[in-house]
Amino acid sequence: MKKSILIFTTLFLLTSVLSCKPKTLPVKDIKIVRQDGSEFTVAAEIAEKPEDRNHGFMERKNIPDGTGMLFIFEKDQILSFWMKNTPHPLSIAYIDSKGKIRNIFDMTPYSTASIVSTVSVRYALEVPQGWYKKNGITEGDSILLP
């Protein structure tokens, strides 16, 4: 009986630990082209499904430099993101349907404050905080969309 309880407890704990692992999504290289023609690439997870967009980078403690997450929406709209349950500081670029970066904002870990696009956009690209600034990427630059 004790052996059965031990096996059950071990399996339960193992299942619990594995279910806490952050979900990863398909990755595509996203090219960003600055207005001066310089190009940069981000290995971005693609969040297209509502459940993937809603979860985003929640619970991720480490997001390596040069990686990110591209959120794809069905239509242009005012977008709003927050950092609930997100421990890693991020920067977000709001991108219109033509691939033009319209806004870039830094976001605070765990904050529930809404970071709202100033115009209707179709995409959002989150990267580790400071990545856009470090690479000289600004509003008006373009993303080559997948």
Give the ranges of each region predicted by the language model.
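Bacterial N-terminal signal peptides that target proteins for export
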Residues: M1-I7
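Alpha-helical and His/Cys-centered functional microenvironments
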Residues: T10
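C-terminal motif of bacterial Sec signal peptides marking the signal peptidase cleavage site
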Residues: S16-S19
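Compact, glycine-rich, soluble single-domain proteins
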Residues: K21-P146
